[in-house]
Amino acid sequence: MTAALLSAFCMSAAGCSLYPGNKETQPANASQAETETKDETKQQPTGETEEETEKPTDAHPEDIEPFPHGEKETKAEPMKNGKRIVLMTDIHYLADSLTDKGEEFQYMVEHGDGKLTNYVWEITDAAFEQVEALSPDVIILSGDLTLNGEKESHKELAKKLEQVEKDGIQVVVIPGNHDINNRNAASFDGRSRQMAEAVSANEFAEIYNDFGYDEALSRDPASLSYTYDLGPDMRLLMLDSCQYSPTNKVGGMIKTETYDWIDDQLDEAWDDGVILLPVAHHNLLDESKIYVEDCTIEHSEELVNRLEEENVPLFLSGHLHVQHYMRNEEDRGIYEIVTSSLSTPPCQYGVLEYRDDESFSYHTQQVDMEKWARRHKSTDENLLNFNTYAPAALRTIFYNQSYDAMKDSEEEETGDLFVKLTQRQKEQMSEVYAQLNAACYGGKAYEVVKEATTTPAYKMWQEYCYP
């Protein structure tokens, strides 16, 4: 990893709060967004009312609020005058049969991007169990369902979704950039990894046929986009923003032919008098100030213009792995809510309550892994103490990410940037990088950014990365 890439990582970590843009992008609590939008023109409802290191440091656990122990499970009443929607994204599920949980697998987790793939099975099961008590109208999985598009991972996750629907909750899915034609699909065995079978776009739709595609009101012939009715008053516009033909790419794009289909769906929603809620994997707005090319849908202004012309108030996405929320333009324009990765601490999902008058509220809910572990009589200390383990693990992963880049840098590549740093300076810089990145992923950079950016280590980032 080059110094340039590391500097981008650092700015990404700080970017949640250091690049605030207008005030709309940074609510007082980035994990919760509430707004009301009542437009009298289009989008009229029909209802009655209106986020191998050589020498890692000890991670410092963050405060992640645990759920009350021993709390009796109570099921919420179904929402009246609107829809309650659970948003899960970037699960990055890996079939249990594809790993022996050995050395190569553990290294992938500890030197990765923050996903706790070593507990993805338990996190997924716990999340599905927990949301049942919310009585949601639907669970939306907005892409990156699998680690790297392994066919076995898709099939195993689909079996779990079958059980969710048997329990009475509808599930709809769209692909993410990791899910289709991914050359990185692999299994893990000891110190090595081997190529695993991936899936094509047609195979993806077949595997998840029961989770949106078979029940679609309309399917786009040019992509895996479709519409899905949530009762008589609301319709989901599930947009395939991924590029996987002829090869898989990270960035997002809506095909030209798909825009014609989108126009038809906007017109039909208006004619039918239903609220249209668009969902995609990639971001509609420039949520990331560093990774615009990889995160924001290419030429997204075309999609923004179409949606705003029809007064569509809200867009939902994932991909960023970071909890974020912003509005296009300061006092008007579409809102976007980006839900963070389920498998990345704080391991949370979004709960959207969208009322018939087109007002909506959104909050994140942490998966209570400790309660789940006790209920299932787990003896795994990490699960039983997940609220301590998870933030510490995340900090260690981000520390490794930073330290590895500096450790591996060479003078001819970096031009003296890192090679002249002392061991202690590298450690200090990695510590502050880990602190900022971990907070940012949970949508809580605002809690630590003021203190972190006054440290000597942060000033070293400024001196050595941005001279």
Give a label for each model feature.
Residues A3, S17-N81, R374-P467:
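Non-catalytic terminal accessory segments
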Residues G82-A95, D233-Y244, V279, Y335-S340, ...:
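Active-site-proximal beta-strand elements of phosphoester/diester hydrolases
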